[in-house]
Structure formats: C-alpha cells, structure tokens
C-alpha cells in the first residue's frame, strides 16, 4: 500500500498525487520487482468543509487522481480511508453518511477499487434526501463558494453533538409484500420473521413468497448495486436478510 506522500510531505492536488504515486510505481516495479497487481495506491482522502479555501477541492483531487491512475496503471488497485473526508462534520451521523455515500458513488465510477469505511454507516445513494444530496455534492465538487456554510446550516443545531438516528418506520404501514421487499433492500432483520408469518397466512405456498416479494427485493438490490448506487457492505446486509427469510420458510416447504 503506497500513500501519496514524499519528501515534500502530503500531496494535496491531483497533479502532485499522480506525480508522487507514478514515481512510487516506477520504484516498486523497476527497482523492487513488484508486480503491478500487488500494488495498492492510497491517494489520501482529505477533509473537506473545513472553512479553509485550499481544502475545497480535496474530494475532487482524490477522484481525479483515481481516474488518472486507473487509466495509466489498470492492474494496480486504488484505495482510500473515507471517514477523513467528513471529519469537519463529526457528531452528525446523517450528514457524514450522506457525504461518504455520495463520495463513494462518484469515486467508484472513477475507478476506486476498495475503501476503508464503516459498513454500518453507509446510506444508499438513492435514499439520500434530495436537498441534502444537493448540498453534499455542492461541497464535494466545490460547485459554489458557500457550499460549506449551506451544508452546516442544513445540519442544524445537531452539528457537533452526538445525535442518534431514529429509524423511519413509515414503511411498516405498507402491505406485507412491500414490507418484505423493503427489508431485503435495506437489510433490516428485525421484522423479517413476523412479516413472513403474516405472509404465510396469505400465501399457501412458501415458494410463492420467495419468488414474489423476496425476489422482488433482491432484484432491486441487483439494480442498485449494478448501477453503483448501492455498495458491497449493503448488499451483504441484504443477503443476510434473504438468508434469514429463506431459513425461516424452509420447514414449511
């Protein structure tokens, strides 16, 4: 694993990051004998939203560096520690999760192969409220000079405080089929058995439940993952929900 860091210190711009990592690549392959596929670049994810103008392009610098590195060295992997990005908003989990999810959405499209991230704190890109997503992406792409201020205002009085995110249970008001599909898409295990018991009273054949609402949910997961709007840790949570559902139904089949 090679960081974008040399004798001059931490590389901050895309040009510097690429130059440092290109040099490291040559040293590793030409002198040390490493195969390109054994090298992982970490261009360093740096904090945005700090109030310091020079930091405004840090997210863009990482994404642009990733794109250029993958074009030049396709066999070499690119990684990054995502939590650094939102350090300015520590204490506001809702905003931080949205920042991480939106950043990953765009970084993966640029070629990011892997990331260090809290898998339990990743929002599904499509589920980020539009008003929050707009402000987050304004910040990530430095689209307006007041991007940081607008996101801070949106974060509200919870900025700097530890805030617990309350689960939105509005989806529990839907049909049992809709609830099962929702549980699979979002990896929610709490209500699976109760909902399956209710579904069994409406469907004589348990296989109909699997082929109906459960597979409907997994199709959505596949579409979201395939389009980059859902990430692997979230897919794993969905798979666990599916496994729990099928295990519950097996004795009745």
Where are these regions (language model features)?
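ATP-dependent carboxylate/acyl-activation modules
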Residues: 1-42, 46-77, 83-253
């Amino acid at each position: 694993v090679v960081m974008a860091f040399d004798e001059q210190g931490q590389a901050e711009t895309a040009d510097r990051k690429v130059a440092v990592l290109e040099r490291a690549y040559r040293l590793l392959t030409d002198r040390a004998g490493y195969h390109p596929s054994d090298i992982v670049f970490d261009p360093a994810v740096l904090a945005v939203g700090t109030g310091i103008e020079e930091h405004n392009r840090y997210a863009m610098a990482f994404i642009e560096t990733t794109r250029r590195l993958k074009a030049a060295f396709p066999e070499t992997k690119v990684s990054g520690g995502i939590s650094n990005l939102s350090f300015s908003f520590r204490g506001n989990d809702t905003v931080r999760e949205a920042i991480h999810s939106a950043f990953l959405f765009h970084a993966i499209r640029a070629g990011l192969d892997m990331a260090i991230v809290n898998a339990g704190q990743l929002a599904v890109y499509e589920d980020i409220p539009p008003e929050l997503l707009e402000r987050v992406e304004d910040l990530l792409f430095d689209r307006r000079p007041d991007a940081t201020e607008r996101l801070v205002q949106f974060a509200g009085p919870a900025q700097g405080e530890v805030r617990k995110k309350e689960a939105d249970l509005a989806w529990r008001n839907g049909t049992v089929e809709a609830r099962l599909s929702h549980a699979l898409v979002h990896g929610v295990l709490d209500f699976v058995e109760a909902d399956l018991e209710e579904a069994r009273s409406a469907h004589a054949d348990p296989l109909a439940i699997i082929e109906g609402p459960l597979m409907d949910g997994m199709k959505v997961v596949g579409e979201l993952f395939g389009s980059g709007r859902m990430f692997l840790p979230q897919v794993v949570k969905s798979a666990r929900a599916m496994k729990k559902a099928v295990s519950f139904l097996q004795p009745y089949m």
